[in-house]
Design a protein with these regions (language model features):
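Amphipathic alpha-helical effector-binding/dimerization core
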Residues: 1-37
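Generic alpha-helical structural context detector
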Residues: 20-24, 58, 120
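Cysteine/selenocysteine-centered motifs that mediate thiol-based redox chemistry or coordinate metal-sulfur cofactors
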Residues: 33-41, 116-128
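Amphipathic alpha-helical regulatory segments at dimerization interfaces
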Residues: 25, 63, 121-125
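Acyl-group handling in specialized metabolite and lipid biosynthesis
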Residues: 44
Length: 128
């Protein structure tokens, strides 16, 4: 199995679980300033509708994690949780991803819960 090399490569916030986890904790004005007016499509699964993206971000805030299933690359999917500071602003993201063929919706939710737990542990380690 080949793994993508995303080091030093800017990734689209709207088409990755890590980007969505980060965006979820920003205010609407901040998101509007960061995201392009038109969200580019990378695969047939990429969310390009702003209102649909806003619904996904609201769900990410509710559950604590964001999911991405083949939205940036056809062969990968993952779940991510933001590490929040004391003001509940995102300072980092815990990302768990793998081959889309091995990640069912149930597994993505499990990965998301694991990412939330790890993000909380990191937050606690960073707290003064």
């Amino acid at each position: 199995m080949m793994a993508p090399n995303w080091l030093d490569k800017p990734l689209p916030l709207h088409a990755t679980s890590g980007g969505k986890a980060f965006l979820a904790w920003l205010g609407r004005d901040e998101r509007d300033a960061i995201l392009p007016a038109e969200l580019p499509r990378y695969t047939d699964h990429t969310v390009t509708d702003r209102e649909e993206l806003e619904r996904e971000l609201a769900e990410a805030r509710r559950t604590g994690f964001a999911m991405c299933d083949r939205e940036y690359e056809e062969f990968s999917s993952g779940s991510s949780a933001a590490v929040l500071n004391s003001r509940r602003s995102p300072i980092a993201v815990v990302n768990v991803w793998g081959p889309a063929a091995m990640n069912s919706a149930r597994r993505l939710r499990e990965m998301g819960r694991e990412a939330v737990q790890t993000a909380g542990e990191i937050r606690d380690l960073l707290a003064p």
